């Protein structure tokens, strides 16, 4: 009986010794990956919170509180809207013949001439803005039968009655007659011409006849492809700058070789020339109250300038220049490192070193993947640069491709409509909101997809490194199941280095490894069986010990050495 107990205890001790790897004294080499104490959470396709070693923020949320005049050329409209500058309102003369990449309109700009409206305000504003200049070409028009150069007290220039400098107010001649007018201008140039003209709407019938003689005027403007005919709307309106009449501003584009014809029997506000329209520029207009500074930035918003190489921004949906795309999310983290598994306080079972299956290694600063070994010369840690570089190349390539996909010039201007176009404005806003919603969703999905692939790639590189080492060692070592190998031959630091760099020759150590295996344990046990044997041997020891005690008690009772008395 005592012999059986001793056998069980010996078996238990043998299993314990093999698990701790401390009694055999064999060298151990473990494969691991970098870990940090506090990782970064990213989203993947399957999980909203995956902790990785490192990640890059893709959404820019910072901006400067000023507009940078370089490399984009800015023109400050100050008190003038762009259309006021094109019409030649008093106070806007400084804008004549200016050029720009971005025309800055101020919310404080005001009209300073006869009250007017533009039925197609947004289109005219867009055409003028995209042309990049107010290059005006004066032309000689012959307006027979009328008086030219009309003026108004609502349009003071230098303290005197004046009018829009780019328009000519035609009224009845000194003989009391008005026209009729029939004037043709041919575009003999090589560029598109923009003509601005208008129709005056008097406040009363008396004003109508005083200015134009006829009770009902009419203006017709024609090109080969278009014709518009306007009859004035006579009637009183709320006074603006002491005027109850209004002027409606219209515009006509005339292509090279085409002609424009003006016909009128009254109420025509005639052009004095045309604007040269260039379709090759990508200029625009921006409404902002931010001052123009002396900084440099390729991206402007209504809230200031953005200086960032990130593919997305959450500063403003109104962005001009080489800008990140606007998304609704305040943060999109792109994984640039592997899954983070912080190291435990005790490395491995009973304090032994452990590999990547059990935990990551903090302090592996010169690489993502590496080796940790323990042999007769001590312990050491070294990075595996090849697998690290392979993972870094894939992730950097992924990051560059993502930036390329979203690095195209993003250009979103603020649309402005007249009140009568409210439904169009609502539709435009709905379309823009829908586009932003779709792009924001696509951006989040794209980043989640890339994160999923990044984590899969880094896990794959770890497995590739493990398989490479396993194929090198073959039967010379045993896989312990936690990312470590127990080597069954003497392996100094040079030997360890050969395993790391892939020059290890298992044939050199094969015989020594086989002999050591036989000495340590004739039967090779896997890590799972070692655990089972440990518990079985422990249980057998306990069972035999209890059986021995019971047997002794029964033997003593039979011989009268022990007497049991039960009291009730």
UniProtKB/Swiss-Prot annotation:
Give the membrane topology: Single-pass type I membrane protein
Which chain positions have S-palmitoyl cysteine-type lipid attachment? Answer: 557, 564, 567
Keyword Transmembrane assigned to the entry: answer is yes
Q: Which domain of life is it from?
A: Viruses
Q: Which residues form the signal peptide?
A: 1-17
Q: What further note is attached to this protein's record?
A: Major glycoprotein, comprises over 80% of the envelope proteins present in virus particle.
Protein name, please?
Answer: Hemagglutinin
Which species does the entry assign this protein to? Influenza A virus (strain A/Mallard/Astrakhan/263/1982 H14N5)
Q: Which gene encodes it?
A: HA
